[in-house]
Regions:
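Active-site-adjacent "subsite" loops/lids of carbohydrate-active enzymes
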Residues: 1-24, 28, 105, 120-124
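Glycoside hydrolase catalytic-domain groove-lining segments
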Residues: 48-106, 110, 116-156
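Active-site groove signature of glycoside hydrolases
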Residues: 17-50, 139-144
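General secondary-structure edge motif
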Residues: 5, 112-113
């Protein structure tokens, strides 16, 4: 009812549009980084996709943008970074998954922290930032921790 439009993070056209926009910005301006804050899926918008499908869509976008930035950096001798500011909790431990590891010892199933708050792996952002760091798709992460140490759900 507000007239706002929401871009679908799973759409290849949307992903390409955002990647192209970021790359055009980097071509025109001497920027140090592309940084995303409050991004991807939003709350209150119904969808038929599972959490895994949404994470795969977001992964696809982040990898596309990362690959484009890395290619530009190599070609032009630049050092532009890609960063993300997710919520301060990756995933809470209140779920029934056990951690598993690949042949190199890298974690392949997500684990969480001893917290009880909004977590960006699940909830509505569906962002596997640990995967992005492990695969070097992002250069830095700046978690949004807008609470004090006395917060009982996440006392850090």
């Amino acid at each position: 009812s507000s007239g706002a439009q929401i871009l679908n993070p799973g759409s290849t056209k949307v992903q390409d549009f955002i990647v192209d926009t970021c790359m055009e910005f980097l071509e025109k301006y001497d920027a140090d980084a592309i940084h995303f804050d409050d991004y991807f899926y939003i709350s209150g918008v119904a969808t038929d996709l599972s959490g895994d499908q949404k994470r795969a869509n977001v992964d696809s976008f982040i990898k596309k943008l990362s690959d484009s930035i890395h290619e530009m950096n190599k070609r032009e001798g630049r050092a532009v970074q890609l960063g993300i500011s997710p919520s301060g909790i990756y995933r809470n431990t209140g779920y029934a998954a056990s951690p598993s590891y690949d042949s190199n010892g890298s974690l392949i199933s997500p684990i969480g922290s001893n917290t009880s708050g909004f977590a960006h792996y699940d909830d509505y952002l569906y962002s596997d930032t640990k995967k992005w760091i492990d695969n070097e798709w992002i250069d830095y992460i700046t978690p949004q921790t807008y609470w004090g140490m006395e917060h009982t759900g996440a006392n850090f």
